[in-house]
Design a protein with these regions (language model features):
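ATP-binding pocket architecture of kinase catalytic cores
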Residues: 1-90, 107-108
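An alpha-helical support segment within catalytic cores of ATP-dependent transferases
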Residues: 84-132, 137, 142, 234-237
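ATP/Mg2+ or Mg2+-diphosphate-binding catalytic cores
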Residues: 209-241
């Protein structure tokens, strides 16, 4: 959006199949208002959010490199280390159930992976504010800074969900994954058993989401995503270093 005096980013509502609670976003914006990686909005109202335009903006898809993965790992560590206490929650199981229950014809074999839900529940422990939507487009690279944007799904959650989500949603390869984990886990040991379960859960979650979207919209991109996530479910990542 361009005015006589300035340029702005304008964001409106995204995917209607996702569970969005606007109170979650408003709370996150308030909690993060003084963080260096946060792009403070000049206007927000329901689905509409406006921030000051950043020159030459790029997202992770065009800036994918090991050095930038290190930057992302450090940013997420800084975010999580503050342990912001949010009243509004993001429950991954509720998210999964929402997708699962909207599918008219469940794909053959989906129920074979339902054991992942039980494993996830045993390890899940919400204890801080998380972003919960770490797709490539939510990392904004400018000349001098890296911002984490779009907090529509932010809420009280287990921070391992964010860690697994970044790896899963961006389909990091082995080298990228290890680079990310080394950048993130600087003062604590990574719980690989927990991360493995959370990675499997994220792949199951996005497989179910993509299956739903392909059924409802019949757009090939969702079929491709479903195939990729099913491949990951059948061939889990090996991440110990």
């Amino acid at each position: 959006v361009t005015t006589d005096k300035n340029k702005y980013f304008y964001r409106t509502s995204k995917d209607s199949t996702k569970i969005v609670n606007k109170d979650n976003e408003k709370e996150a914006l308030k909690l993060l208002s003084n963080e260096p990686y946060f792009l403070k909005p000049v206007y927000i109202n329901n689905d509409n959010l406006i921030t000051v335009f950043q020159p030459n903006p790029k997202t992770f898809i065009s800036q994918r490199s090991l050095s930038n993965i290190v930057r992302i790992g450090k940013l997420l560590k800084e975010f999580h280390s503050k342990k912001f206490q949010a009243e509004n929650t993001f429950n991954p199981i509720d998210q999964f159930n929402s997708y699962y229950n909207q599918i008219d014809e469940l794909p053959y074999g989906l129920d074979d992976y339902m054991y992942i839900i039980d494993e996830f529940k045993k390890l899940y422990k919400a204890d801080r504010l998380c972003h919960n939507d770490l797709v490539e487009g939510n990392f904004l690279f400018t000349k001098d800074a890296l911002y984490l944007i779009d907090f529509e799904y932010a809420g009280y959650n287990d921070y391992y969900f964010d860690i697994a989500s970044f790896i899963s949603e961006n389909d990091l390869n082995y080298e990228e994954t290890i680079t990310f984990l080394k950048a993130y886990f600087t003062d604590e040991e990574c719980n690989y058993d927990k991360l493995k379960v959370f990675l499997n859960f994220c792949d199951l979650l996005w497989y179910t989401w993509a299956t739903l979207l392909y059924e409802k919209r019949n757009e090939e991109i969702y079929n491709e995503i479903a195939k990729e996530k099913l491949h990951r479910l059948k061939n889990p990542r090996k991440i110990v270093y």
